[in-house]
Amino acid sequence: MRESEDSPSPKRQRLSHSVFDYTSASPAPSPPMRPWEMTSNRQPPSVRPNQHHFSGERCNTPARNRRSPPVRRQRGRRERLSRHNSISQDENYHHLPYAQQQAIEEPRAFHPPNVSPRLLHPAAHPPQQNAVMVDIHDQLHQGTVPVSYTVTTVAPHGLPLCTGQHIPACSTQQVPGCSVVFSGQHLPVCSVPPPMLQACSVQHLPVPYAAFPPLISSDPFLIHPPHLSPHHPPHLPPPGQFVPFQTQQSRSPLQRIENEVELLGEHLQVGSFTYPPSAHPPTLPPSAPLQFLTHDPLHQEVSFGVPYPPFMPRRLTGRSRYRSQQPMPPPPYHPSLLPYVLSMLPVPPAVGPTFSFELDVEDGEVENYEALLNLAERLGEAKPRGLTKADIEQLPSYRFNPSNHQSEQTLCVVCMCDFESRQLLRVLPCNHEFHAKCVDKWLKGNRTCPICRADASEVHRDSE
């Protein structure tokens, strides 16, 4: 290298040329490509730590005056494309060492938006706020409506996401393979094949959308690597499967009730495709390693632009399940309602059958009335009957004389008038005195004393 290349201006030119080269990799006359329209074959190559083709092969001619690139540059680009495809396929089975990943981070001062996704170690990811926006537009033919997720604040000790990199979205050939149930509602989640979206883990299992299952619930999720069945269609990606896993960490009962994620049943129609029963992945053998993902270090926000699909929840917890299984009790039967309804119907009396509901009701009422009468006879009257005229005349009476009157009572309680001379007074067995006309009228309806409520007929029984 010449000494002039170490000056700051050629370095800036090299960086600008690398930017122009990335943008010129796609065909020029085609319209601007959107992220969801790009396939896995259009991803540009990733940067190797021991390859510096970007600085050595750039010419100093401005981008607008350059013509077709030389043959050696095209051959090197094709070799890097093939090498990147082989590396992205083998990334699930080998892991780059930590020092090599740091070497990848250092020489790259600029990250273009269409750089291929690469594995990031949790310790190598800086604690910064990155945002990933996956927008799935209506590419499915009258199918599910787009769902957009916003993931923010990746902690250094959590699961690193390929934030800041290009995440290809689903097209009509990449149908969602799994769904997430949030609080009783099934939400279809886009399933991206493993070579297109990967997250680093200890075992490096292919994670289809591993960043999005723990969105609302706080349960960790057990991720199974997708296995293709023999009858799996070749144009469909391998479907993912999320299985809830109970850990020993302490959680509140509300979180245990709300956090449920399950796979949708067989023949679930997503978009214009229907999964047959054979398309579901088989169970994972016991010897395969499993990776646990927790949602604690990820503070995420979810924005759904569409209403939830009309799926009913499968599992109900606690008392709600017991209440839903109990049938509603039948309404009570009113015997007087049916004859009334039948009488409203226009049925001829000669043709219509005879009904005996009213007779049965009347018989029951008559029996009840007779029983009440028998009870009244045994108990007697609540209010005793008045005395007869003969019984009233048998009570003692005398003319009032103020000179020889010995009783302390000086007035009649019935009429509230004082006793006068030569008035006829009647004395009850309780020794209470009244005007004869006043007390006789009282005793015709009552057999007790108006003052003390004593029985006025006891004198007659004693005399008899």
UniProtKB/Swiss-Prot annotation:
Sequence ranges of Basic residues compositional bias: 64-83
Bias type Polar residues, positions: 38-53
Function: Acts as an E3 ubiquitin-protein ligase able to ubiquitinate p53/TP53 which promotes its relocalization to discrete foci associated with PML nuclear bodies. Exhibits preference for UBE2D2 as a E2 enzyme.
Name of the encoding gene: Rnf38
Record-level GO BP terms: protein ubiquitination
GO cellular component terms given for this protein: nucleoplasm
Motif (Bipartite nuclear localization signal 2): 64-79
Pfam families, per database record: zf-RING_2
Cited PANTHER family: E3 UBIQUITIN-PROTEIN LIGASE RNF38, GH10160P
The protein's name: E3 ubiquitin-protein ligase RNF38
Catalytic activity annotation: S-ubiquitinyl-[E2 ubiquitin-conjugating enzyme]-L-cysteine + [acceptor protein]-L-lysine = [E2 ubiquitin-conjugating enzyme]-L-cysteine + N(6)-ubiquitinyl-[acceptor protein]-L-lysine
Source organism of the structure: Mus musculus
